[in-house]
Amino acid sequence: MLRKVFYISDGTAITAEVFGHAVLSQFPVEFDALTIPFVETEAKAHDVKLQINDCFITTGERPLVFHSIVKAEIRDIIYSSEGLDYDFLNTFVAPLELQLGMKASPVVHRTHGKANEGYEARIDAINYTMDNDDGQTLKNIDKADLVLLGVSRCGKTPSSLYLSMQFGIKAANYPFVEDDMDNLKLPTALKENKSKLFGLTIDPVRLHEIRKSRMDNSRYSSLRQCRIEVKEVEMMYKRERIPFVNTTNHSVEEIATKILDVTGLERHMF
């Protein structure tokens, strides 16, 4: 039976999930996780406590409980359960109070509320990215913070969306397709915004596998075509001095981190 894990918060539980995932990923085992957001009342906290205790009775193992709860009275109820508590927020609050010389003033939903001053900026970035996905238009390319380039299915769209959703970056993307390969060059609008360009590449065999799952037995998905496109695009990156990274076997989070590291783009945290 898998070890039970609870992610609990009086907000969205995103912070507890991210922290918990980061810690548990260090161990080569699987876990049975349950996320419980918006534990905002003592009554709900008691319900959660019962779930944790029932899990302990059923399995004989104390559940791992990662939480980020602002209100002390609710937090204390979770503390009193049979779970093993890992309190992300309050582990660091007391030491920081000493260093900063002030008391914390906790507010529920401060980290993930719509009132957050960066909310509108993030929505604006997401809308921009969706409107400028896959080379739909180059009219507003000058408003981009970043333009991702690459062959079809190399990871441009998920990387663009992740950057806009997580960091408020206006990330357009532009594809190079089979018809471009005979005379591969940058469109004028991209040349005029060259400082914003960043390339993605991928192992041709991996690209072949991805395309096969979408359009099997086609020229588009053939290994030969994948090799041609990757080779031509990488040569163009080098010729135009466009920085690029290989996305093969990397998660969207890793790709985005590499892009931010190379470009120096500012991360807007919300």
UniProtKB/Swiss-Prot annotation:
InterPro entries hit by this protein: Kinase-pyrophosphorylase, PSRP
- List the lineage, top down: Bacteria, Pseudomonadati, Pseudomonadota, Gammaproteobacteria, Alteromonadales
Q: Write out the entry's keywords from A to Z.
A: Kinase, Nucleotide-binding, Serine/threonine-protein kinase, Transferase
User: Cross-referenced Pfam families, in alphabetical order?
Assistant: Kinase-PPPase
What is the official name of this protein in its record? Putative phosphoenolpyruvate synthase regulatory protein
Q: Which species expresses this protein natively?
A: Shewanella sediminis (strain HAW-EB3)
Reaction equations catalysed: [pyruvate, water dikinase] + ADP = [pyruvate, water dikinase]-phosphate + AMP + H(+); [pyruvate, water dikinase]-phosphate + phosphate + H(+) = [pyruvate, water dikinase] + diphosphate
Concerning NCBIfam families, the annotation shows:
PRK05339.1 (NF003742)
Role, per record: Bifunctional serine/threonine kinase and phosphorylase involved in the regulation of the phosphoenolpyruvate synthase (PEPS) by catalyzing its phosphorylation/dephosphorylation.
Q: Name one GO molecular function term.
A: ADP binding
Residues annotated to bind ADP: G150, V151, S152, R153, C154, G155, K156, T157
Similarity field: Belongs to the pyruvate, phosphate/water dikinase regulatory protein family. PSRP subfamily.
The EC designation for this entry is 2.7.11.33, 2.7.4.28
